[in-house]
Structure formats: C-alpha cells, structure tokens
C-alpha cells in the first residue's frame, strides 16, 4: 500500500485564496522530505466558485514539482473534455520532461452540464468526446505525435514537443465518474481514482464492473493500481472533527448535489471517510480498500482548521506507515 495527499483547495470563509494555496504548498514541501513515506500529491480541478479555486491543476502541479525533489505530483482530475487535447498533451509532456518523470496525469470526463455548455461542448456526446480527447492525448504522450481523424477533431499530424521523458509517457489515472467511464477504463487497463464523495456502495459497484469488464474482454489488470481518495480529519474530540468537515463541505455539497439532502450526504461522507477520533479512521478506510481493490490511499487534511494539527496527524500516520514497511 502506498500513500499520498490530494488537495481540493476549497477557499473557506475568512481565508484568502493566497492562504488557501499557501497551505497546500507548505504541506507538499513538508512531506517531500525523505523523513516522510508519502509518495504522491494531486491537485483537484474545479471552476467558477470557491469550492475549489484551482481551475488549472496541471499548472499547479508544475509549480509544486519545481519546489520538490522526491514526490510524484499530478492533476487529480484534469477535465480533458473541456480542454483542447493537444494543449493538455503539450503541458503533460513538458512536465514529464522537466520533472524527469515525476509528473502524473490524473484526468476525468466532465461531470458538469453547466461546464459542458460554458466550454461549448455537446452534452449528448459527452462520452464520445471524452474518448476522442483521450486518444489524442495518449497518442501524443506515448509516441510524441498525434493525427486525429474523428467526429470531433481532424488535423494534420503534429509533433508534441518536448517529447516525454518517460518511455510511455507519464503515469495515468482516470476518475471513476460513471459506469461508462469505468468500463472504458477497464478495456484499457487504466487505473481508477475512486471519489471521496461517492458512497461505498457506488465505489464497490464500480470496482466490480471494472473487474467484470476486464475479464470479459481478456484484459490483464494484475498490475493495475487503483487509488482511493479519503477526507481525513482526526481529533481527540470526535465531534470537533465532524463539525469541521461539515463546515468545510457544506457549500460544495450544496453546489454539486442540489438534488440531494445536504446533511444526509455529508453524514454519509463522515461515516465512510477518516473523520472522528484517532480510533475512528482505520476500519472505514480498510473496508473501502478491500471493496475497491485500491493499492494507493490519497488523503486530504484540508478540513482541519489548525495547520499544526495537520502536521501532527501526518507525523502520526507516517510513523504507522514506517512500522509496516517491508
């Protein structure tokens, strides 16, 4: 099992955007030390509200790569459908080259109908556009060139410069956003990123569908290393941790899931993520790992209000990781 962090970068009330991003920078540079046994850090993409103030996660990842030496850093969910695929490929290839293989491309389809319309994409062909964009990006990263001729893109063969440092391009993960994406990923043996806000039943259903699809199409997934995102807030006082998470998530849940009961959704997240006292985090996370088959755990401590408490929890978890190293 490997461990890393992910950053949603929600801008909390009373906190500036500078402070929000600075907290991410401080945490990433902290765990880049050889003292820590965290391997990765990922930046979330979100648009048009304070419920995630990074609209360009590859750019943010590039900044963090320049500050670090050890960590592999990437986008958690670069939305490839609403960006030009050649541009995504150029940025990913450049970071792979400049970081000497430390960049990771985590990508996603577009879940927001508003963003699809805003960026002038057709909602009715969402999955087809996603797949077309990926093929262009993957061709560019694995061969250095792309020459698409499909319903959405048709242009002459172009070279993507600089070509990647890594032999087959940067490591890739795709967000498990729908059954269509999960089945598509299984056919390509692409590892999934399971979303922290999905309930365990949904995550398990996606994992089963992934395995079933791979088996049906004869795809070897023995080396696939899914990753599980987990909201973490630990406190000696369980209620303090829970209230901090409720406060942190309330606006995002209202924005993203307007059709759901907000409190019910947040309570489910609290129950199934690592939220509560120091004894509360293990069983729920262990169960999610078992149900999804994940080999990587990504943690977000951003709901914790005291940065010193964050360091203390990171140190505590780091000791536990160290005790279990082979």
UniProtKB/Swiss-Prot annotation:
Repeat among keywords: no
Q: Which cysteines are joined by disulfide bonds?
A: none
Biological processes, Gene Ontology terms: bioluminescence
Could you tell me the EC number(s) of this protein? Answer: 1.14.14.3
GO CC annotation: cytosol
The chemistry this enzyme catalyses reads: a long-chain fatty aldehyde + FMNH2 + O2 = a long-chain fatty acid + hnu + FMN + H2O + 2 H(+)
**Biological role:** Light-emitting reaction in luminous bacteria. The specific role of the beta subunit is unknown, but it is absolutely required for bioluminescence activity.
Tell me which PANTHER family the record gives: BLR5498 PROTEIN (PTHR30137:SF8), LUCIFERASE-LIKE MONOOXYGENASE (PTHR30137)
Q: Which family does it belong to?
A: Belongs to the bacterial luciferase oxidoreductase family.
What name has this protein been given in UniProt? Alkanal monooxygenase beta chain
Q: Which organism is it from?
A: Aliivibrio fischeri
Q: What is the lineage of its organism?
A: Bacteria, Pseudomonadati, Pseudomonadota, Gammaproteobacteria, Vibrionales
């Amino acid at each position: 099992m490997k461990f890393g962090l992910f950053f949603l970068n929600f801008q909390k009330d009373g906190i500036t955007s500078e402070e929000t991003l600075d907290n991410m920078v401080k945490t990433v540079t902290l765990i880049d030390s050889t003292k820590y046994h965290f391997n990765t850090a990922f930046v979330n993409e979100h648009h048009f509200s304070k419920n995630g103030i990074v609209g360009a996660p590859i750019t943010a990842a590039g900044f963090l790569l320049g500050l670090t030496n050890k960590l592999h850093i990437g986008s958690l969910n670069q939305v490839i459908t609403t960006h030009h695929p050649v541009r995504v490929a150029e940025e990913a290839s450049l970071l792979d080259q400049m970081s000497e293989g430390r960049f990771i491309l985590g990508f996603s389809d577009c879940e927001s109908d508003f963003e699809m319309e805003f960026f002038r994409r057709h909602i009715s062909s969402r999955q087809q556009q996603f797949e077309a964009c990926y093929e262009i990006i993957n061709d560019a990263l694995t061969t250095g060139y792309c020459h698409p001729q499909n319903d959405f893109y048709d242009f002459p063969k172009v070279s993507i410069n600089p070509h990647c440092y890594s032999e087959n391009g940067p490591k890739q993960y795709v967000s498990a956003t729908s059954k269509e994406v999960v089945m598509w990923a299984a056919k390509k043996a692409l590892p999934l990123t399971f979303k922290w806000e999905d309930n365990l039943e949904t995550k398990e259903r996606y994992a089963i569908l992934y395995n079933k699809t791979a088996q049906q199409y004869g795809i070897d997934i023995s080396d696939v290393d899914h990753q599980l995102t987990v909201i973490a807030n630990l406190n000696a006082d369980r209620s303090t941790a829970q209230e901090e998470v409720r406060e942190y998530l309330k606006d995002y849940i209202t924005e993203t899931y307007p059709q759901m009961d907000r409190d019910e959704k947040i309570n489910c997240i609290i129950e199934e993520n690592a939220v509560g006292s120091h004894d509360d985090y293990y069983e729920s996370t262990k169960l999610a790992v078992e149900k999804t088959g994940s080999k990587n755990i990504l943690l977000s401590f951003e709901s914790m209000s005291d940065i010193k408490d964050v360091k203390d929890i990171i140190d505590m978890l780091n000791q536990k990781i160290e005790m279990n190293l082979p």
